[in-house]
């Protein structure tokens, strides 16, 4: 009955009020969910973080695989030192393995495996680098001694050779035939026998010296030296003949 009693003007006013309320509600900002209100940049950063986390998770097993089988550097140094000291017998006994395991904090199986690999890879380089192989060193020592002896044997004639050549070269300077050939006077008949003996004795001594030098030195004596000795012998013979002639002349004069 009340609705029927309402005038059309009142109904119109109510409708207008309802329409205004609807417009106001439409003009007000709507409260969206937090996922919808985020910007695209924030969305990309979240995606990158998620990918990085997954990459780290995937990379952990590979990192563990790479480090698997590697021993600590300090323990490897200790094992290398022991191998270098015992490089000619790189087979540790059980007691030595226990001692090394205490020093390196490694198990006996790890130490034995390391030595098996090191004997194939590290030990040959140690021996070649240092040259400490006993057989090779023994041979090289013998070769060095042989070469040393050869060098000393070769140095003996080399040292004695120049001395012999000096003696041979000094002989003509001390000898007198060149002076006689250059124009010196023949000795007087009174002193001829004594000079004759000295002159005959001198070539013998000189010949002996020349023989010694020729045997000690490898260089042969030249033929010019023999020519000088032959001319000297001729001069000696001439002097002897002249002295004999002078003695005969004196005897003839003393016994007319």
Curated annotation (Swiss-Prot):
> Keywords, A to Z?
DNA-binding, Homeobox, Nucleus, Transcription, Transcription regulation
List where Basic and acidic residues composition bias occurs.
9-34
Which cysteines in this chain are paired by disulphide bridges? none
Q: Does the keyword Transcription regulation apply?
A: yes
Q: Where is the composition biased (Low complexity)?
A: 209-224
Q: Where is the composition biased (Polar residues)?
A: 35-45, 166-179
**DNA binding happens at which residues?**
62-125
* Function in brief: May have a transcription role in testis.
- Protein name per the record: Homeobox protein TGIF2LX
Which organism does this sequence originate in?
Papio hamadryas
The gene behind this protein is: TGIF2LX
């Amino acid at each position: 009955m009340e609705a029927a009693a309402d005038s059309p003007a009142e109904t119109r006013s109510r409708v207008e009020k309802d329409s205004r309320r609807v417009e106001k509600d439409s003009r007000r900002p709507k409260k969206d969910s937090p996922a919808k209100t985020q910007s695209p940049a924030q969305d990309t950063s979240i995606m990158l973080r998620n990918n990085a986390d997954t990459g780290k998770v995937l990379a952990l097993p590979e990192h563990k695989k790479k480090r698997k089988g590697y021993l600590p550097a300090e323990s490897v140094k200790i094992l290398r030192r022991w191998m270098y000291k015992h490089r000619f017998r790189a087979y540790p006994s059980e007691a030595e393995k226990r001692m090394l395991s205490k020093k390196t904090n490694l198990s006996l199986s790890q130490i034995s495996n390391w030595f098996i690999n090191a004997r194939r890879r590290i030990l040959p380089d140690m021996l070649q680098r240092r040259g400490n192989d006993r057989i090779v060193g023994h041979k090289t020592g013998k070769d060095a001694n042989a070469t040393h002896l050869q060098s000393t044997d070769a140095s003996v004639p080399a040292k004695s050779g120049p001395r012999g050549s000096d003696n041979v070269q000094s002989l003509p300077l001390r000898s007198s035939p060149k002076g006689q050939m250059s124009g010196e006077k023949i000795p007087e008949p009174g002193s001829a026998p004594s000079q004759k003996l000295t002159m005959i004795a001198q070539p013998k001594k000189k010949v002996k010296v020349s023989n010694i030098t020729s045997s000690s030195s490898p260089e042969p004596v030249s033929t010019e030296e023999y020519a000088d000795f032959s001319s000297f012998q001729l001069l000696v013979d001439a002097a002897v003949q002249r002295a004999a002639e002078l003695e005969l002349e004196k005897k003839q004069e003393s016994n007319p």
